[in-house]
Each structure stands twice: as structure tokens, then as C-alpha cells.
């Protein structure tokens, strides 16, 4: 029988280049748990060598095989046993295995896994707005199987493929196929289907060289986000009254559609997908999360009331997909084809390989409904080869899985009539109107215009959001002040925009949790992207979390916002309450001060007494309370110093421009720099680069320098392109161009 032995203990990690001393570690492990998010501006990208010993397990009968199973190695790995290479792997997010039987000997065997998170021209991701953690961050197993066993060699897959389909009579068919290695005529495969209570509801037997079968289950329980009913399909490899190997898959019976006018429906029920995106890291753990960590994340998202998760920007842990199956989420799963296109043909083959692994390894998960081809891949510009690669990926996915839909996350400035459309089945845009560019009020009109002009495209929003730092507060929140209040205000608006448009097939807030991004330094917090509805340590739910809970949760809730804005000045102050109940009653120091009937957001203007005040909100059977202190002046530490500095910097920029006519048509004289030159080209001239980087800093608060941080992601962009994506003051891009065209190439 199959035996799975964890090899997570007793590893030695060394660094051949000597960056760090040798240490003893336990898996899951990453060497970037701290420097990947501590704000120092860089993190260790190198090769680490993990070493331990193991004793080869023995099968009762001769001919048994031993496999090393690596659940993920970021980003590339070489597996050796006793100094001999067993396998290599490029791609940091998927399972891979190696048959090491013939490399083992009696007694202790040395297992070495060389792992690198360095960039290569042949592998994705190239550059992106998150930390590329290095290490064996999901664990390693030893698998012992008889000589005849279910497949372990095909793209890290489970060896079994199940396709449930509901039937018109209320039942369901289960198309099942498994693959047997070294099969012989005497072996058969026994299939059994059990419902969620453990009752067998169907079974079948097939010869091991022709394992495909269709089984019927009457009165099938459907899987949906509200009722995630699971069936367990077990395959047993048998001969002479003996089971030699056994595998299983948890599956769900469901059907779903997406149309441009009706959006998403599951099992015939219109159900707009509203949820979040998620990265797989946590404070000072990096991406080395345990099964418990993954389940906790899924539970927090369920508590939010979301029904969909975009798992960005790579394959996630089986533990998390299992949680999504169990708890009920519609999942968008994708590969790290992101931000920067690599023209090396081997890079496209790596894309194909990662997509194949993603689908083969995760085909049985009922929660997965969409395969994502790429994310913001036009950041570095467009070329025919890039478009062709997307068509090729679409064809590949269709061949591997004709049962699911494909999708794509367009960068905000992707032309609405360009060649990147009509490749995937459904599409989404990453839009940050109200943060990087434009105003939050533009989101609804943009969707309406796109829908009217492209009535044949199923459109969604794959990213949207703002940074929210729980230290910063304001009574007059503004874009780029990084306050918790502006983040909440933004999400109040967007939540209503999406509720008013059920034809938007899916929306995914960016992001559920703050996450590591070593290159960032924004809002006074370095090393992280702070757009999460919760903090990176999972300790604090920002007010924006409760905006969505009020809109999405079916459980009664009420939440008073602004509890960290605890000191208030002025004759009156606004008390904002989020609730999914129709009416909220507010009490201040035990006295009723107001009752409102509203939709999700309730605002009360109240007078506070000197000193501390108890605020109580009651909505039906649910209550919430906070304490506020009335003060003469609110503390200066509520305001991010950089916010005022940035405003002053923009003002000084225009002062230095002087009397230039910023309304005149822009000129682009030959032989001189302009906003049409890429950052990489501008970097060839010290003066031009200084101008451009200062402009980027003022407009985005990003510090970019050649070879540092997000330079690789942004170097192909032009200031002209950036201006279409980010919110620049009127005349700003014109003034930059007017200064650049004075500099000769």
C-alpha cells in the first residue's frame, strides 16, 4: 500500500555564496520570512541548499518504488539523492516529484534540494509587485508505493480525474479516469463514490488498462457557494482480494454560466461573484504557511461574506484549495504570467508547463471555476508575440480542461478595442480609479460605457483598492492620504457600484490581507502593500472589511467605524456605522441620539461630551460599541507627514516650471528626450532620469532607481503610459515633457 512520510523535520540550510550562515530549519520554510517584508528595500535572492537524510521505506513485495514529493520550491529547484540528480524543476508554486528508487541504498540516504529564487530569462514570474520568497515553503514528502501503482509522474497530478455533471432528472454523472503505472492484466480499479455523510452512492470496476468509467448518482446534492456539498471518489487498485494502492478526490456537482448581460449563475441561480484576491504570506512567516494558516485565511474570507477568491498570482497550496471546496468559494486560479513579458521562447514553454501543472494538479477541485492566463502583462508594452502566446495558452487550457472558463486580468490602460480582447471566455480589468488615477466616481461610468460599447464581452473587475494604514486618520479623507477613513470611503462607493451592476460577472477587491512587497515604501510603511482589508498579521480588521461584511454577509452585523480615530476635536463629529440591517439606533453615553433607516452605511452627526464618550450602535439583535475622547486638538500623529510633503512637492514642481504654456500641444522634437521614452531609455541620461524619477515619486510616491525594487517591472514604461494609469495633477505630464525635450539624447 501507499505510504506517505513527511520529511519536514531535520533540514540543514546552507548558502553556497556565503550570504548567511548555515542553519537548522523545519519545513515549511523560506529564507525571506523577514527581509521579504521588513522594509529594507531589498531581500535575498540567491540559491539555498537544503539537506537531510532519510531511510528508504520498504514495500512488502519486491519492485516497490520511492518518490520524493516537493509541494513547492521557489522558484527553481534541483533534487539530488546521494549526490546524483533526480530531477530539476522551474516554477515556484506547483507540486513535482522524482522517482529516486534507483538512487537509494541501504541505510541513510542524503537528500539535497537546491532552491533558487533568482531571476532567469526562461522562467516566470519576471518582476511583479510582491516579494518572490525563496525556499521549500510548503513541505516535502517521501512516497512509497508498490511497483504497480496509481500514477505519480504526470505533471505532479493526483492520478485521478473526476468530472461530475448534473443531469436533468436531478441526478449526476461522474466521469472518472485514473492512470496506473506498470499495470498488469490481473489488476482492476474499483471506484466508490460516497456522499458527505460517508454513504456509498455508486461504485464501478474497470480493468487497469482501461480505467475510464461513467457512474450515475440519483438525487445528487449540488455544490454551490451557499451549500458546498462534496462527494468523495475513491479509486482502489486491486488484485486477488488485495488493495495495492488507493487514492481519492473530493468533488462537487455543479453547473455555471457567465453571460454579458446576466453575469454569473451557478446551478441556474444568478449569483454575482463578489469577493477578494489573496496572496499567500503572513507577517514574518513569509509564504511558509501551515495548513492551519491557510484554513484561517479562508475562514476570515468566509466571515467577510465573500463568495469568490482570486488566488493571485500563482498556484496556491492544496490546503487552501481544499478549504475553498469545503467552505464554498468560486475560485479564479492563475499562473505567474505577470507584468513583464519575456521574449525568450523557453519562457513561453515555462508558461505552458506551469499552466499544465496548475490544471492537472487541481482539476478535481469544484471551487475552481476560472483559469487565469495572465495579469497586467501589458505593463511593458504589447507585441504580436505576446498576443500569440495568449492565444496558445487559451488553446492549451481548452485541450486540458474544456469544462471551465478562462479569464484574464487586464492592466487599467489596456486598449478597450485592442487585440487582447476576445481571447479568453471572460475578462476583467484591474482599475484603481480613486487611487492611482482618476476619481472613485469614474468606476461606475467606465463599466457602463464598456458594457454598452462591448455588449458581447463578459466584464469583471479583477483588482481595485487603496492603501489603508490604521495609524492615519482624517475627518476629511482624501486620495493618497493613506488614512483608514479614505480606504473605507472608497470601498463604500465601490461596493455600491458593484451591487448596482449584477451583470459585472465578478469583482475581486485587492487585497484581503496586506502582503509583502520588499520594494515598496508607501504610507509610512515599508516593505508591504497595505491595500488589505486586514493587516498582514491577521490581527486587525480595518473598517473597510466591515463595509463588505455589511454588503455581503448574510449574518446580522453592525460595526461602528473610526474606533482607532479615538480622539476627536470640534463641536460635533461624524459617527459612521456599517450594518446589513435596515435600521440603526445610536446611543452616546447611554442616551439615544438618533435612529436611521439606510442601506449599509449610516451616518450620525453627534456632539461629544468633554473627556471619554461611550458610543453604542444597535441594529436589531446585534450591537457594537466604541469609546471616543473629545479633545481640543486632534494629535498630529494622525496625519502622514509625507502627505503634506508630497502636496508641497507638487506645488514646488509647478513653481520651477515657471511660465511654460502647459495648455499648448506637446512637442516631441527628434533627438531629444520626451515622455514617449521608456524609463530604461531615460536612464541613459542622468538629468533626464532625475526628472522622470522625481515626477514618478511626486505622482505615485514610488521611489524607482535602475536595478532596484520595481525597476524591472517599470523600466519599459513611458511617462506617457504612466500618466494614463495614475492620477497626475492637471498640466503635470505636460510640464515634464516640456523639461525633457530640452535634454539632447
Task: Mark where each language-model region is.
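Extended acidic/polar, glycine-enriched regions
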Residues: 102-108, 177-259, 611-612
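Surface beta-strand/loop "capping" patches
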Residues: 149-183, 549-581
